[in-house]
Amino acid sequence: MNLFSSVQLAPKDPIFGLTEAYTADQRPGKVNLGVGVYYTDDGKVPLLRAVLEAEKEVVAKEAPRAYIPIEGPNPYNSAVQNLLFGKDSALIQAGRVVTAECLGGTGALRVGGDFVKRLEPNSQAAISSPSWENHRGIFEAAGYTVLDYAYFDPKTRGVDFDGMVKSLQSFPAKTLVILHACCHNPTGADLTKDQWKTIISICQQKQLIPFLDIAYQGFADGIEEDGAAVRMFADSGMSFFVSSSFSKSFSLYGERVGALSIVTQNKEESARVLSQLKRVIRTNYSNPPTHGAAIVATVLNSPKLRQMWEDELAQMRDRIKSMRHGLKEKLAAAGISHDFSFIEAQRGMFSYSGLTADQVAKLQEQDAIYALSTGRICVAALNSKNIDRVAQAIARVLMSK
């Protein structure tokens, strides 16, 4: 018997498969605008000074590599809660927030999805159209039927809010709705505070289950500003979920540092929720790793390192904004009649460029410039050395018949 004779070759991941093609490309001057990674102006993944200092402190302790609690270490989980909800949060003080360290934002989404599926076996999940490529796969793998809600208007390159409202109002009660808290991936189009108020009201009226995904806190306007949606949900009195990731904001991509936070109605409910959450984690990966979470906790719990980190994060944010402005200006200077103001208006690491799949293919074939077939480009991969070449190539494919 050949056990694996029926195994089919799986399609490559749209993002990491693109990176494989980019790595194999031997042409000089190649540019990878596909993967969601922040690069310095020298084209390198940064090692933040705050992270380096924290890691020195962690290593100096020479702590044994023993198992840590299923939900992760308390210093880390407390730091995550304070970052999301504020250190003076009434929810935290009332014991209404349960947090568990997870394997990146992806792990937090899956653990949260598994938890809800055990609680509500008939629940469906809903993601924005478009959304991060892995959202659909994560929740389908957790057993959900995945619905789509309207989000992006290709004409305005902004949020189709009327369509979003109509979609959410059509969903049955207990639908798990995945919401991008800031820096929407892939479009860069975010909701206003007034729009968030409407979404919260719909979730309450329709008894939807909000699941906020916040992977880019600090990349739009700042730590506090980018956490506004989470805190608005906190003020609503609803129970909800938050997936958070420190891959981007701490440049700790390979450490897989994330967290799942669940807001409950009271302290007693939190204890029951945590007990079941630990069961979900125990049968998945049992315990989380120590190193990445220890670094993040050390930074967030040290006033000096926290300020150093926020300063470095601000520098990353400002560089991305500078690249947005530069790309807009250079495309406009190329004499194309398009309105490129949307590039500067969009927020976070990505821009939904409007490039077609054929145009993206031409960029790859003719210029060794790699982007997703959806037209999503990572603005954080642009720098002073490649932005002219990228702008010229985009202008050429836009002008070609």
Residue ranges and their predicted role:
Residues L274-A293, V299-K328:
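Structural signature of PLP-dependent enzymes
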Residues E310-E365:
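Conserved PLP-binding catalytic core of the aspartate aminotransferase-like
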Residues L52, E57, E62-Q205, G218-F219, ...:
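Conserved core of the PLP fold type I
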Residues L33, V146, P210, F240, ...:
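Hydrophobic beta-strand scaffold residues
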Residues A229-R272, Q276:
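Active-site PLP attachment segment
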Residues N2-P75, A79-N82, G86, T283, ...:
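N-terminal "arm"/small-domain region of PLP-dependent enzymes with the aminotransferase-like
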Residues I214-A215:
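Conserved Walker B
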Residues A94-R96, F342-G348, L372-G375:
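Short Gly/Ser/Thr- and Asp/Glu-enriched loop/turn motifs at secondary-structure junctions
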